[in-house]
Curated annotation (Swiss-Prot):
Pfam families hit by this protein: Ribosomal_L7Ae (PF01248)
Keyword flag DNA-binding: no
This protein's name: Growth arrest and DNA damage-inducible protein GADD45 beta
Family: Belongs to the GADD45 family.
Function: Involved in the regulation of growth and apoptosis. Mediates activation of stress-responsive MTK1/MEKK4 MAPKKK.
Keywords of this entry: Apoptosis, Developmental protein, Differentiation
Organism: Homo sapiens (Human)
Quaternary state and interactors: Interacts with GADD45GIP1.
Length: 160
């Protein structure tokens, strides 16, 4: 490996860490400010009613769920809708970390039904211009990825 290749790999890894941290920060802030829609069905309803308020769509799935055909069909339809409406999309793995970030109860309790975390929408109502460093960082990453012909960039949330 040449020095240039090593530097490029290091920069890519650092960029991925920055974007992952930005997504985590954005999700926590969006939930705190009631700007987060959780669930495939709820997200589809919101995008049908007010697609202009959606600024980011996160599609979350872990490797063991990749064979879920129904979920993949939902993702395909949501991705298509997002592309038609210029909504940034990011694929995310690490459902356990996602649940942890959103304060979901642990699976071991079993008494409460867990929310569907496979699709998350971050909204920005028309009435105010909410600016979040995390949102700017993620939007920049999405734009950069599209420039590299990666239409739906991927990040992995790591457990802590």
């Amino acid at each position: 490996m040449t020095l240039e290749e090593l530097v490029a790999c290091d920069n890519a890894a650092q960029k991925m860490q920055t974007v992952t941290a930005a997504v985590e920060e954005l999700l926590v802030a969006a939930q705190r400010q009631d700007r987060l829609t959780v669930g495939v069905y709820e997200s589809a309803k919101l995008m049908n009613v007010d697609p202009d308020s959606v600024v980011l769509c996160l599609l979350a799935i872990d490797e063991e769920e990749e064979d879920d055909i129904a979920l993949q069909i939902h993702f395909t339809l949501i991705q298509s809708f997002c592309c038609d409406n210029d909504i940034n999309i990011v694929r995310v793995s690490g459902m356990q970390r996602l649940a942890q970030l959103l304060g979901e109860p642990a699976e071991t309790q079993g008494t409460t039904e867990a929310r569907d975390l496979h699709c998350l929408l971050v909204t920005n109502p028309h009435t105010d211009a909410w600016k979040s460093h995390g949102l700017v960082e993620v939007a920049s990453y999405c734009e950069e990825s599209r420039g590299n012909n990666q239409w739906v960039p991927y990040i992995s949330l790591q457990e802590r």
